[in-house]
Each structure stands twice: as structure tokens, then as C-alpha cells.
Amino acid sequence: MRTKYFNDGVVGNKKIKASFTKTGEMIRMFYGAADYKQFVEFYHTGIKVNDSALIYLHNDINNSFSQEYIKDTNVLQTHIYNSYFRVRITQTDFVPISENVLIKHYVFKNENTIDLDLSFLVYSKILRNLNNDTSGYVKNDTLIQYNHDFSVCTFSNEKISSKQINGAENNFMQGSIGGKDYIGMSPDSSISYNLKKIKPGEEKELTIFVYINKNRNKCMLNELDDEIDRIRKLDVQNLKDNAVKYWRRYVREHDTLGINKKELSSKIKKIYNRSILLFPLLVHEKTGGISAGIEVDEDKTKCGRYSYCWPRDGVFVTEAFDVVSMYEETEKFYNTFCKMTQSKNGMWEQRFYTDGRLAPCWGYQIDETASVIFGIYAHYKITKNKKFLKDNLKMCENAINFLEKYIDDLFENKGKFQLSYDLWEEHEGTSFYSVATIFAAFSAMIKIYAEVKSVLDINKVKTDTIKKQVENLEKNAQKIKEYCLNTFYDEEKKSFVRNLEDKKIDISLLGPIVPFRMFSPNDKKVKNTIERINMTLRTYTGGYIRYEGDGYMGGYNPWPIATLWMAWYYLEAGDDQKALENFAFVTNSASGHGYLGEQVNNDAMKPSWVIGLTWSHAMYLLTLEKILEKGLL
């Protein structure tokens, strides 16, 4: 795949997601869920004006671009102006709420003083593998790119004027495709539409539909023809209007913080609203699994891929869901996804596809398991729904059983458990953050038992069992706290350290303070640690990197997650001014559409790597809520 890493814009519904560059090029298209399956290797579009060569719509020296979402929606508009021919193009991309098809609507306006003959060309290639070869097929004025499992269909309500199934690349660049073949064994093919003459000041419109027939549900050609003909007859304007209404209503319904009624900066509102609009696109409709983000690197040229569900990430994100009253999505994550992915021994593996299947892993992280229990009680604190606790009690008890064995192994130095990776999946061993999550899980389980007893059908034996379990949890929680004080505080550095092997300063040292509350934010050792964090992790631009020497992705870029974590700490410690400074840093680093990245480019102060990371957006909403609770904005 010709990897393009930055998904500047995303559109979709519950089934389909598509991502775009800032110039409007579609670079990915998923059907089924946000993480699987991706179908498009590339999808190029261009125009031929009079006798010119192709003007590649999204990368031409004479083209200028602007892009925006229709306010408070997932309807994306890209404006393209070609200064040589003086053609203005408005491209609108959206997925209807009620139809599983991507709609690309174009308006071409001739701002020249002469007539212009325009042709519109599409050149696309679908992903394939050695066991599932692909072909191109033009039938019923439709380009059907297919293999055994799926077909990607490009069509319009206009007739195709020319086509080329094999060897189309060079001819496409010349803007002149053609060939006798209507079918061929090629993963890339091209079609064109003749828009004919456009007079000065006139406009012409063209609608392109991209329909994915996954698993060849319409396996007979006549069935597929019928479905395409049905889609062609759809009222595109009505579908767009309905999508706009749906998303605006969605934002209103989930504006639990009342942000849009407050006198706040437009950037804060944009990030907040974009978070609300992004979240439902990344949740699996059936399981509740939450994708970390739209994929950026299918070929793993720079990373191990992102579009999976990490249980720990999901816990942070569901807390943000609760901030914007997405309670149903939170409960589906725990009631369905977490139950179906828990191993028999009570643990959760490192990461999963959002449909619940195990994803590629390279170890396990003990905090994944502990975080789920913490998250379940965090959700209960918001809803006070004891049935939710009851429904998940067995799952929590299984996880606690695993964690107790892990802690016993750690304290007794038995060495029976495989070493756990840390929060960042890089260091294998015993880390302060990971152990603190177990403290948080035990503390949460004690509270779960206290709340759920009234709705359980229990006899004296069960009552005594719970009482004994609570006593064990209290004892182990205290032992964990003492262990952490004795193990992870370095007297030479006068600071907590992330582990005993490299003794580095790490932003995850904040975890035992916020949100896990093992230590007070004003404890002397904690304050010493904060001083050390500020000396080692704060960048010259004012953000924070994850840990000493963090050079992931080629540079010491600050992370919104790390910077917002510092804001969390300062809010707890009562240093509101520093909290607001950290919050402002992240606010100012957002993309023009309101997306937050995994990292921030120090020079450009824009998102760097994984634009629209759900964890970043979750931390932003959680921090914003805390700031508003203190009346700081």
C-alpha cells in the first residue's frame, strides 16, 4: 500500500468509515467496523479540461485547497480552485445514516471567460492478497472491483464515457483512458464521465457512489445490479440533509457539559464537538469495542498499527463517554466486549479487534486487566446502576482472582508469571504504574461489593465469603501501597521512578496520584516527583513527552495524553493556573477540524501522528469537565 499516514478528515455511519487528506483525497475506506476491513489501496480522482493532461484533483501545482465540516456534522467539504483553468470545485463527502454507501458529490463551476469541456476520471485500486486475487469489471455503468470475498463498486447516475481495466496508470495521468476489455484480472482500473461543455459562470454537478458488497452478499450479478440501480435512485440532497440533522441533533443530545451554551473559545468548542462526533464512528456496533483510531500504517512501516481495541484505552475512553452521556456505549463495552474477550484465567490480553477477536500481540500488560475493574466502578459512580454491577460481578471476581495471584507472585518473588509490559508496551518488567492499577482495582472491588450486596441473592455462606474477600483486598491494597513506597521511590533522585531497571522519569508516575489516588497530590514525595517530571519531560513549547529519552516517531514531541495528565495533577493539587496552561497547550495543538493527535509537532504546533486518537480526545473531555467543575472557564 502507498501509505499516507494522516487521516485529516473522517466520515461515516455505524457500518462505513472513510478517511481523507486535507486536500480531499480518500485514502481509506472501512466496512463492517472502524478497524476491519480496509478495502482501498488508493482512490484517485481528476479532471481533464479541453485538451489538457489530467489535473489530479488533490495534488496539482495550480490547485489551492480549503476544507471544513458542515458545522457540527460528519459531512466533509473540500474546496478546490484550479487557477490555470479557473475552475472551482466543491467536493462533499458523507455517508448517509440509513444507507451503507459513501457519497461523493461534486459541483464544478466555470469561472473562466471561455467555454470549458470537462471530463471527470476515477482511478482506483483495491487491496488484495495472494490467496484472494482481484479483478475489474465494468457492467451496468459501474466499475466493479471484486474478489471472492467482496466487491467495491463505483458508479454514478451518469453514464460512463470511457473505461480501462488493465494498465490504466499512464493513460489516467494523461486524462485519456480507453480499452476494449470490460473485464480483466487487474486490481486497479479507471473510468471517466464526460461532463461536456460548461459555459462561463455555469455549474455542473456529479454524484459518485462507492458501495462495498462485503462477503459478496449480493453474489449473483443480477442481485448486485438491482442494488446499484436502487442506490442510483436515492435522493442525495435529502440524504445529506438528513445526515446534517442527525449529527447536529447527536451533538445537542450529548452536550452534557453545556459547552455550546457557554462563553468559551471556539477552539474548545470545536474539539469538544468533534470528540462527540468522532466517538460513535470508532465504536463497534455490536460488541462495543472501541478502536484507538482510524488506521494510519497498514504496512507497519513505522509502528505496530493502531486500529485495535486496548481494554485499558477503552476504560479511559468510556469515562469520557460518560462525560457526554454516551452511557449505552459504555455499558456495551463492559457488558459485551469485555465479557467476550476475558480469558478463562481472568485476564485480558494486550489488544483485540473491535469485534472481540484477539489481535496481534507481543506480550501482555497487567494494567489492562486491572483497569477494567477500575472502569466498571467509575461508570457506576456516574449512573448508580446496581444492575450493571451485578451483571459484571462474576467478570470482576475472575479478574480479581488473577490479579491476586499476580500480586502474590510479585511479593513472594516466585517468578511464575511472565513479565508484564508497561503502559507504553516497551519495557518488560514490574512498573510503578502497573502495580498502582492493581491497587486501584482492589480498591474499586471493595466498593463494588459494598454497593452490590443489596441486589444479590446471597446466603450467610456467600456473605461470609464476600466479607473475607474484602478483608483480603484491603490487606493487599495496603501491602501494594507499602511496596510501591519502598520499591519505586529513589532516594538519590528524590523522586518516584517508573521501574527498578532503568529508573526513568515517566509521565505515568502520575497514575498512582490521578486517577488511582494511592498517594495525595500534595505528598512530599509526590511533589518531588513533579519537580523531576518538569525538569525532564517538559518541552520548550510547554507540552510533555512520555518519558526520558522518548524518541518515538523520530523526535521528542509532546503528547496530548501526557500534557493533559499533568493538567489533571495540577487540578488535584490546587495549582489551577498551571492546569489551565497545560490544557491551553493541547487546545492550541488541535487540527483545523478539532482533531487531537497522538503527538504534537513542536515546530508547527499541529497534530503529529495518529490524528483523531480516541485516548487523546477522552483525556481532553475528562480534563475539561474537571476545569468546569472548578469554575475555571
Report each predicted region and the residues it spans.
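Extended ligand-binding clefts on enzyme/binding-domain cores
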Residues: 154-164, 431-437, 468-561
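C-terminal capping/lid segments that line or modulate ligand- or cofactor-binding pockets
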Residues: 1-44, 306, 317, 352-354, ...
